[in-house]
Every structure is written in structure tokens, then in C-alpha cells.
A protein has these predicted regions:
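Non-transmembrane functional regions of envelope-associated proteins
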Residues: 1-188
């Protein structure tokens, strides 16, 4: 079809003459094989993320965008970690008194740096609607071109307190399974 030809032509032009880098000040930090060898499999305990975040901030990072959803408590550290061991609630509580809540450590690092944008996720399941808090467009305004979702999955509240903002990463692949565009706004 004409649409497929247009997509393939666009892809070809992107390969032979890609856009020039806008700035060398933007750095994408990825998890590599050597990181996995050093820290173990993903997900990492949040106290490790707090240390890595502090290193980014100390290195001069002005903005850190986590493209990972932190919607649940860290089960790899602190009191949550104790739940994976068979013991009585009394023993678990006594041991828990000596452990630091790793989510609080990560929240502290986020709050101290004042340079974080966290991620939320969207839901299409009508049975699990989570209300939004701050609309940026008034109710009743019809924008038929917006992608529409029934709710969001926000990050943990105590992580968002010190964050600059919360973003959403929504992709909509074309029929050939290639993502060529992303929406700037969505309707929830």
C-alpha cells in the first residue's frame, strides 16, 4: 500500500541521513552486561538505585528521567525482603527494626537532588480505573486525535514527593511493528 511505501521510504531516509545530534549534553545511561555482573539481575534494590542516582547527580546531571515504573514497594531490600523467608511475624518484626526501608533511601536521594522525572503507566482495563489528579485540559474539551486510556498506574507516592514531575511513555507501533511517533498528550 501507499502507507507502507511511505513508512519504508521514511525508514530508509533515516538510515542514510539520520538527524544530527542536537546536543552532546544529553546522555542516556543504560544498564549494561557489566552492570548486571556488578549488581546482579534486575530489578536492583532501591538503595543501589539511590547510590547510582547520587553518582549521577554528583556528576552534574541536571535532569534524570527514570523510564522504569516504581509502583510497588522494593521487595529486594528492607522489611519487604524479610517476607521471602519463613519466620514468625514476631521474629520478622524484630529483624525489621534493624533494616532500613530501601524505598525511603531512594525517595531521599530523589528529594535531595530535585532533578528527577518518574514514570507512570497507562491502563486500558476498565475494571482498574485509577483517578487522575491534575488535568491539563479542561473537562468537556473534545480532542479526537488523543490516545485514550481508562486509568493510570502511578509511582509510589513517597517517591513522587521530591520529583520534578511524572511522565508517561506510550508507544503506538505502526502496522509493521515499528514505532515512528509518540503522543505528546494522552486522555485518561
Amino acid at each position: 500500500t501507499v502507507k507502507t511505501l511511505r513508512y519504508k521510504t521514511w525508514d530508509y531516509f533515516q538510515q542514510i541521513q539520520p538527524r544530527a545530534d542536537v546536543s552532546d549534553r544529553v546522555v542516556v545511561v543504560n544498564i549494561t552486561e557489566s552492570d548486571l555482573k556488578k549488581y546482579g539481575q534486575w530489578p536492583w534494590p532501591r538503595h543501589i538505585l539511590a547510590l547510582l542516582h547520587a553518582n549521577l547527580t554528583d556528576s552534574g546531571a541536571v535532569l534524570v528521567n527514570y523510564n522504569v515504573l516504581f509502583a510497588e514497594a522494593d521487595r529486594m531490600g528492607g522489611k519487604e525482603y524479610l517476607k521471602s523467608f519463613p519466620m514468625t511475624d514476631e521474629v520478622r518484626e524484630q529483624l525489621g527494626a534493624f533494616l532500613t526501608d530501601t524505598d525511603k533511601v531512594f525517595a531521599y536521594a530523589i528529594n535531595e537532588s530535585k532533578n528527577v522525572v518518574l514514570m507512570m503507566s497507562v491502563k486500558s482495563d476498565k475494571d482498574q480505573i485509577i483517578p487522575t489528579t491534575t488535568p491539563i485540559i479542561q473537562k468537556g474539551v473534545v480532542l479526537p486525535w488523543l490516545y485514550e486510556y481508562n486509568g493510570i498506574v502511578p509511582p509510589l507516592t513517597h517517591l513522587t514527593v521530591g520529583a520534578l514531575g511524572i511522565g508517561v511513555n506510550v508507544t503506538s507501533p505502526e502496522p509493521d511493528a515499528v514505532v515512528r511517533k509518540m503522543p505528546v498528550l494522552i486522555r485518561v
